[in-house]
């Protein structure tokens, strides 16, 4: 018994060390993209529900369905063609997470030089990760808020003379967020799988490619480590969701009576 995940069958490196190198990249991309998607899609979903079937709602719906229908590999390739192409706009690097010729240190969350150097490499991947999450989350938020705004207690709140802002944000938003919180429980496990396609296109050394290689190479230690970490993160995600349920919905309480 070693007390760890052993060594990879592919390169004979420690599985734990390999995961420590790759996991932060996938986790960072997933977390940042989810935060951005929530910050954009939740307000838009609320306002679309309030303006149901009007010009704003119809316009947002068309845009969201267009974004949701675009394959991630197409968006990633288009972003590289437009913004990492000397013939168009060479604004961002096209591949990898750093330039070994000018910066050869490891990624660090606390080193500002590391963050400044590597930040441009993450802009396009974050956009590619965010757009599909934004489209799906926006639709869920809109449908949830439409159901909530048609409830009896919302009509009662309006009959009391409360402002629309107070009715929506104070009475409607809490219940409208419940499906979004349920979705949030899957964020952490998603950081393990990452996105094989997007990480490959942008040259991100994350977990997606590692999982794919481990399966093809029948790398048992790596596969066991991935499933173990996925299980731990799944439990963590559900725990955080349960806590958020109790915060958002006053009907839920975990205290003993």
Regions found by a protein language model. Give the residues of each.
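Hydrophobic, well-ordered secondary-structure segments
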Residues: 44, 56, 60-64, 76
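Short membrane-interfacial helix/loop motifs at transmembrane-helix boundaries
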Residues: 1-17
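Phosphate-coordinating loops and pocket residues in cytosolic domains that bind phosphorylated ligands
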Residues: 10-11, 61, 94, 169, ...
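Short, hydrophobic secondary-structure boundary micro-motifs
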Residues: 5-9, 75-76, 91-95, 157, ...
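Membrane-water interface segments at the C-terminal ends of transmembrane alpha-helices
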Residues: 63-96, 128-130, 134
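Alpha-helical transmembrane segments of integral membrane proteins
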Residues: 23-28, 32-56, 72, 101-257
């Amino acid at each position: 018994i070693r007390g760890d995940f052993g060594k990879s069958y592919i390169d004979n490196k420690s599985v734990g060390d390999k995961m420590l190198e790759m996991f932060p990249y996938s986790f960072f991309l997933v977390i940042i993209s989810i935060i951005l998607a929530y910050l954009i899609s939740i307000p838009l979903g609320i306002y679309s529900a309030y303006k149901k079937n009007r010009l704003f709602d119809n316009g947002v719906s068309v845009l969201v369905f267009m974004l949701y229908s675009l394959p991630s590999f197409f968006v990633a390739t288009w972003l590289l063609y437009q913004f990492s192409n000397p013939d168009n706009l060479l604004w961002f690097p096209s591949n990898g997470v750093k330039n070994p010729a000018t910066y050869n240190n490891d990624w660090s969350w606390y080193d500002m030089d590391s963050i400044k150097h590597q930040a441009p490499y993450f802009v396009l991947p974050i956009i590619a990760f965010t757009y599909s999450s934004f489209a799906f989350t926006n639709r869920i938020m809109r449908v949830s808020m439409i159901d909530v705004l048609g409830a009896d207690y919302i009509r009662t709140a309006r009959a009391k003379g409360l402002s629309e802002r107070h009715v929506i944000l104070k009475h409607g938003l809490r219940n409208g967020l419940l499906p979004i919180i349920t979705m949030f429980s899957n964020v952490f496990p998603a950081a393990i799988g990452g996105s094989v396609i997007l990480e490959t296109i942008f040259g991100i050394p994350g977990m997606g490619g590692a999982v794919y290689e481990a399966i093809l190479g029948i790398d048992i230690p790596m596969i066991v480590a991935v499933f173990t970490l996925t299980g731990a993160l799944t439990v963590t995600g559900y725990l955080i969701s349960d806590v958020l349920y109790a915060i958002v919905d006053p009907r839920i309480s975990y205290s003993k009576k």
